[in-house]
Amino acid sequence: PSILSADFCNLERDLKAIANADLVHVDVMDHHFVPNLTLGEPIVGRICQVTDLPVDVHLMIEDPDRWAPEYAKLGAASISFHMGATHAPVRLARQLREMGCKACFAVRPAEPVEPIFDILDEFDMVLIMTVEPGFGGQKFLNNQMAKVRRLRDEITRRGLKTRIQVDGGVSPKTAHIVAEAGADVLVAGSAVYGAENPAQAIDDIRTKAEAAFKA
């Protein structure tokens, strides 16, 4: 789940509430690359220390070439960055992988996915945004599923192991749509932390996605 929808004054409590999840998704925003400001290295470092879950960091910041390795040093298991922000995406991806961190590429709704096909084998995962980046709780953009399908077809055609992550508007109502399109990593924020029982919401999303995988 995305902690963007968690209570930042009770973050350790809210991390424990999602102990049944597969990962913790942390959105780092600098108020320059996107119009919001969230958290930075000190808090991400503490999150890595207090949770047993893999920490998946999404950098919505300028100059990830400089900052991404710092988050890898803090213990991030995977780091996503944007093409429009990096000067050398392949070099950065290789650097992160050499540090034992998975390299991930993030694609915003208005951006096509095809330009990254040539360097797809350099990345462990591609993050397809299904809301405009910057704020949680937005409406799911169903038109992005065509992008997910094209990406899945390319990954399958080339026999790659690159995973597809979808973030934005994911809920028990949309999980099957995302999974059917070909995504295998689902990030939910408000659907989890806005639920009366976050752990149950995670199970519901997982069940819906797994059913779609098997269909």
Model-predicted regions and their roles:
Residues 106, 127-130, 165, 186-187:
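Conserved beta-strand segments that form the floor/walls of ligand-binding pockets within enzyme
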Residues 1-80, 85-88, 103, 116-123, ...:
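Conserved N-terminal beta1-alpha1 strand-loop-helix module at the mouth
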Residues 25, 165-166:
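Generic enzyme active-site microenvironment
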Residues 97:
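Anion (oxyanion) recognition and catalysis
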Residues 110-112, 171:
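Short acidic loop-to-helix transition motifs that present clustered carboxylates
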Residues 169-181:
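Acidic, divalent-metal-coordinating active-site segment for phosphoryl/phosphodiester hydrolysis
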